[in-house]
Amino acid sequence: MALYELFSHPVERSYRAGLCSKAALFLLLAAALTYIPPLLVAFRSHGFWLKRSSYEEQPTVRFQHQVLLVALLGPESGGFLAWSTFPAFNRLQGDRLRVPLVSTREEDRNQDGKMDMLHFKLELPLQSTEHVLGVQLILTFSYQLHRMATPVMQSMAFLQSSFPVPGSQLYVNGDLRLQQKQPLSCGGLDARYNVSVINGTSPFAYDYDLTHVIAAYQERNVTTILNDPNPIWLVGRAADAPFVINAIIRYPVEVISYQPGFWEMVKFAWVQYVSILLIFVWVFERIKIFVFQNQVVTTIPVTATPRGEVCKEHLS
């Protein structure tokens, strides 16, 4: 009757030698060459320690209903008109103060609990002899992230447009984008910039000067800007019609750059190290088998006796 192999298992063979023998020294050297070189290879290949990472997040943005407007007029109209939601600023304007009609609406288009855009409309009443040639506008927002990095800050959108011909309406459609000069820290709440962009309680004109406001704002490591506003300047205003600013500002998903924490860095480094280590383990395992089987270093081979046979020997 023909016989077939139905089951097999390897027989364990051990090799014995003294702790001060060449075999022990070889094993120590093999262990060092197995575990240390993968660490050096992973480190020298760059990117071993994860110093910067990124992720996507929809920020929580809310319009603060703080506005500062400067409307630039033609030379025959007296320079400019101004208005803001800050009473101290308005008191400084004198005859140049002109109170507009403002309407705003924020919209959550995907119903995720976070606002997605702002609809802003401003109607500035003008006299028949006044003609607007340019606009400078600041809108302020509260801006917060919640996942890896958790900054909370007061930010702004600055719009500036000027044209050679008088206009009746300025239409703007852009994104409120996050700008980072360095990665955000993921170690707890960061409220360094949770202060008003404009010091609305100051009685000094210097604190409302746009040059000063923009310069101080740009000193921050994290800011927001109105990106791609695509201004459309409409002409042909009736004598008694106001100058209108229509703005749609979107709050898009942002790619956030941040400094990873300690355990994230260790996890990233560990994955790189282990992927190289497995190759070295496989290679040196084959080398050790060759060295001990062929007695390149002197040892005493011992074949392990199966447990069943050991019991039989004791019984006999």
UniProtKB/Swiss-Prot annotation:
GO terms for cellular component: ciliary membrane; ciliary transition zone; MKS complex. Keywords: Cell membrane, Cell projection, Cilium, Cilium biogenesis/degradation, Glycoprotein, Membrane, Transmembrane, Transmembrane helix. It is found in: Cell projection, Cilium membrane. It comes from the Eukaryota. Disulfide bonds: none annotated. Glycans are attached at residues 194, 199, 221. It is a multi-pass membrane protein. GO terms for biological process: cilium assembly; regulation of protein localization; smoothened signaling pathway. The chain crosses the membrane at residues 23-43, 264-284. Signal peptide: none annotated. Transmembrane component of the tectonic-like complex, a complex localized at the transition zone of primary cilia and acting as a barrier that prevents diffusion of transmembrane proteins between the cilia and plasma membranes. Required for ciliogenesis and sonic hedgehog/SHH signaling. Part of the tectonic-like complex (also named B9 complex). Interacts with TMEM107. Belongs to the TMEM231 family. PANTHER family: CHST5 PROTEIN, TRANSMEMBRANE PROTEIN 231. This is Transmembrane protein 231. It comes from Pongo abelii (Sumatran orangutan).
